[in-house]
């Protein structure tokens, strides 16, 4: 999920993004890009670093595989699909306008331009569908469910209101339109199963959650009332119990998605009677007042020591404990503990630097180096003899990659793979149709 793209980063950082299951973080820089593993609180493992492309403003990794998609300011209309372990380019593709965002899961790769969206089959990069004349979308706002069994795509259905268009990228058909907000959309996100969609408008005061694919409103949360903010990051926890939102302010909000009570036909208790009276009375109030009475507040918060910087947040489980991570455009990763029972103020337990050496800080103190067992990330990060990128020229919209490689099936699998086994990388050539 890319949350800091668009090329308007601060200093050396051009973009920030987590992979689909938030097990790694990617940063695009003036000098190239880096991938870090998020498997340990105490230290960051550098999975890969590349200086081949400069001014990288989009970098997306496919889960924990070796596949990464990169777009640079030098060629903003060209998408490059790379296999960083082998040091090769699988394919590249050029579009009619600048690429604003890219989303991918194990079935589909989505390329979003300002007024069109391209849907590719990720296994062979064949272009399956082009959504033309979509509402003007200057920030490339869109999201793709990571559950490949449904592959729902959501994008703005209007440039003037907060309408969400829901598209089935597997069956290549429109599902529904959700009137989510009165103001234009600022952020949208699916949960891990693709059964819920969260949205926020440019005002940034109210966050709503809808059921998918029917588009029924399930929850409504109020981030604040005093001021409008620019929400830059919106993400569910993997178990869909929490929803996290960060903005250009110093506060990150975590909302708890309480299990919705089943509506019984009859409830003769005093509380049930009062509840019915309350709901009946709210129907006579102005709509804005009635909505506010039914909105929930944040379950937990984080007070950042900065504001005004672009940042990306996520909720993960690291070393069996729930954590809230915030990556800032200044090049730092902040790790907080989240109390899943009581919520409240989250506690900062670690601060990592994403630029230069992978030093970590806790309350201003640097950690001493300690031996670390060899992991997948450490293995991938080992330097190799300067691999030259193989340039693959040409691409057919009907036939996919030309003289390139089909993306290996195991890169799309759920389980672990043997990345060093050459038998798992049979060179498959695709001929012209």
From Swiss-Prot:
**In the record, which residues are listed under signal peptide?**
none
A Gene Ontology molecular function term for this protein is:
phosphatidylinositol-3,5-bisphosphate binding
Per the annotation, the residue ranges of the short sequence motif Nuclear receptor interaction are 127-132
Pfam families of this UniProt entry?
A: PROPPIN (PF21032)
* Gene Ontology BP term (one): cellular response to starvation
UniProt-listed InterPro entries = PROPPIN (IPR048720), WD40/YVTN_repeat-like_dom_sf (IPR015943), WD40_repeat_dom_sf (IPR036322), WD40_rpt (IPR001680)
Q: How does it sit in the membrane?
A: Peripheral membrane protein
Q: State the UniProt keywords alphabetically.
A: Autophagy, Cytoplasm, Cytoplasmic vesicle, Cytoskeleton, Endosome, Golgi apparatus, Lipid-binding, Membrane, Repeat, WD repeat
Q: Where is this motif: L/FRRG motif?
A: 221-224
**Is Repeat there in the keyword field?**
yes
- Compartment(s) where it occurs, according to its Swiss-Prot or TrEMBL record: Golgi apparatus, trans-Golgi network; Endosome; Cytoplasmic vesicle, Clathrin-coated vesicle; Preautophagosomal structure membrane
The record's domain comment reads: The N-terminus might form a beta-propeller domain involved in specific binding to phosphatidylinositol 3,5-bisphosphate (PIP2), leading to the association of the protein to the membrane. Association to the membrane can also occur through binding to phosphatidylinositol 3-monophosphate (PI3P). The L/FRRG motif is required for recruitment to PtdIns3P.
**Function in brief:** Component of the autophagy machinery that controls the major intracellular degradation process by which cytoplasmic materials are packaged into autophagosomes and delivered to lysosomes for degradation. Plays an important role in starvation- and calcium-mediated autophagy, as well as in mitophagy. Functions downstream of the ulk1 and PI3-kinases that produce phosphatidylinositol 3-phosphate (PtdIns3P) on membranes of the endoplasmic reticulum once activated.
What family is it from? Answer: Belongs to the WD repeat PROPPIN family.
Protein name (record): WD repeat domain phosphoinositide-interacting protein 1
Look up and give the organism this protein is from.
Xenopus laevis (African clawed frog)
Q: What are the leading ranks of the lineage?
A: Eukaryota, Metazoa, Chordata, Craniata, Vertebrata
